Amino acid sequence: MSTINTDTNKTMPHISVNAQYIKDLSLENPSAPSSLAALDQRPQIDLSLDINITNLSEENFYEVELNIEAIARNEKYKLFQIELKYAGVFNLINIDSEQHPVLLSVHCPAMIFPFARKIIASCTQDAGFQPLMIDPIDFGALYHKKMSEHQN
């Protein structure tokens, strides 16, 4: 039988997820019911994603917010538009502050993204459409792209 040394765990670097929540959720189905009858072809999906990081008042506590917007269109209609702000509160424990930007921009969003993805899929399905299954996102590539653009 193994035991866990909690004193060692308190000093080990780690990320604690203190909360996850929907900050804002909006779904528009502007052309219903006509748009629901026109689902014989796959719609064009325009997707945008943004990440906002807020340093909270307590030391090493941060809110990481995913802003996801998806607009589905076909030849005739704007089928739906969904906007989701989904956030988590993270505590970076015993982690060097130089590592905070990459952890907050890559690892924390990757932890909460599956939950945001599920919310979007459920909402679009509840609106009468096929669930919108957003492909996995490489937050590391997004971070490196943003950093290279910032340096130029």
Curated annotation (Swiss-Prot):
Location comes to: Cytoplasm
Q: Taxonomy-wise, where does this protein's organism fall, top ranks first?
A: Bacteria, Pseudomonadati, Pseudomonadota, Alphaproteobacteria, Rickettsiales
Domain of life the protein comes from: Bacteria
Q: Which terms under GO biological process does the entry name?
A: protein folding; protein tetramerization; protein transport
For this chain, one GO molecular function annotation is: unfolded protein binding
Spell out the GO cellular component terms annotated for this protein, sorted alphabetically and separated by semicolons.
Answer: cytoplasm
Q: Which organism is it from?
A: Rickettsia peacockii (strain Rustic)
Q: Which gene encodes it?
A: secB
- Keywords, alphabetical: Chaperone, Cytoplasm, Protein transport, Translocation, Transport
InterPro entries on file: SecB, SecB-like_sf
Pfam families under this entry? Answer: SecB
Q: Which NCBIfam families match?
A: PRK05751.1-3, secB
In the record, the note on similarity to other proteins reads: Belongs to the SecB family.
| Keyword Cytoplasm applies | yes
Q: Can you say what this protein is called?
A: Protein-export protein SecB
Quaternary structure? Homotetramer, a dimer of dimers. One homotetramer interacts with 1 SecA dimer.
* Function of the protein: One of the proteins required for the normal export of preproteins out of the cell cytoplasm. It is a molecular chaperone that binds to a subset of precursor proteins, maintaining them in a translocation-competent state. It also specifically binds to its receptor SecA.
